[in-house]
């Protein structure tokens, strides 16, 4: 595995760091999405990442082993309690982590913040995240989009992951797409198979467009 460069290519126009929150249930593919985004964007943008786990720093370890970013650019946060509390009701532990990473890497273009696995009601505090991406997976059943909840209805981008599993779990992707449109209105969504990189480019395009990132 080739280690990523410690000093990525720089943008010609400097903008304030964009904070991108990635949330979703346990096992939906949040860490995989973060890994794919880091690997695809690290040569263009200066990236740092913060992961949340309740009692461990497992996601930080996984990203480091995968070579998503240099080890010093990934920070693990142990929340010690409900994951949604650390990203919304009392986001102080993550706000402090963001400040620490930006003090180390003041030229960072994007700060990714991955929440711990949580339910459909989890949302990011606007003080912590500029853009929110919520990840669900097909294996949870085709009914998930119509269950609603802030993660489904209010996130800036909904990612419906593991589309390759639809035939195995009896999920109809057309039904999921229809229900998603009903629940989200004009808010965008992307269907992905992250292991095959399907849909990753669409997520990146969304981040660049909505985050006003120009190279």
Swiss-Prot record:
GO terms for molecular function: GTP binding; GTPase activity; nickel cation binding. It is found in: Cytoplasm. The keyword GTP-binding applies. GO terms for biological process: urea catabolic process. CDD domains: UreG (cd05540). SUPFAM superfamilies: P-loop containing nucleoside triphosphate hydrolases. Its main location: cytoplasm. GTP binds at residues 24-31. Pfam families: cobW. Keywords: Chaperone, Cytoplasm, GTP-binding, Nickel insertion, Nucleotide-binding. Transmembrane segments: none annotated. It comes from the Bacteria. InterPro entries: CobW/HypB/UreG_nucleotide-bd, P-loop_NTPase, UreG. One of its GO terms (cellular component) is cytoplasm. Residues 1-21 are annotated as: Disordered. The keyword Chaperone applies. Homodimer. UreD, UreF and UreG form a complex that acts as a GTP-hydrolysis-dependent molecular chaperone, activating the urease apoprotein by helping to assemble the nickel containing metallocenter of UreC. The UreE protein probably delivers the nickel. Belongs to the SIMIBI class G3E GTPase family. UreG subfamily. Facilitates the functional incorporation of the urease nickel metallocenter. This process requires GTP hydrolysis, probably effectuated by UreG. This is Urease accessory protein UreG. The lineage of its organism: Bacteria, Pseudomonadati, Pseudomonadota, Betaproteobacteria, Burkholderiales. The gene is ureG.
């Amino acid at each position: 595995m080739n280690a990523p460069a410690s000093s990525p290519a720089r943008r010609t126009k400097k903008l304030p760091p964009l904070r991108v929150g990635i949330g979703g249930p346990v096992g939906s593919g949040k860490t995989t999405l973060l890994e794919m985004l880091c690997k695809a964007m690290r040569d263009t943008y200066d990236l740092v990442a913060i992961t949340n786990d309740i009692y461990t720093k497992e996601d930080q370890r996984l990203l480091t082993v995968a070579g998503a970013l240099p080890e010093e650019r990934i920070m693990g946060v142990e929340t010690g309690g409900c994951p949604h509390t650390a990203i919304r009701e009392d986001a102080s532990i993550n706000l402090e982590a963001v400040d620490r990473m930006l003090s180390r890497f003041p030229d960072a273009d994007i700060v990714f913040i991955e929440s711990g696995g949580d339910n459909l009601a989890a949302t990011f505090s606007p003080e912590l995240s500029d853009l929110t991406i919520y990840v669900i997976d097909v294996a949870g059943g085709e009914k998930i989009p119509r269950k609603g909840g802030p993660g489904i209805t209010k996130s800036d981008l909904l990612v419906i992951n593991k589309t390759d599993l639809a035939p195995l779990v009896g999920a109809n992707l057309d039904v999921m797409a229809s229900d998603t449109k009903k629940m989200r209105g004009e808010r965008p969504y992307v269907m992905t198979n992250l292991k095959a990189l399907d849909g990753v480019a669409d997520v990146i395009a969304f981040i660049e467009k909505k985050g006003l990132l120009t190279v």
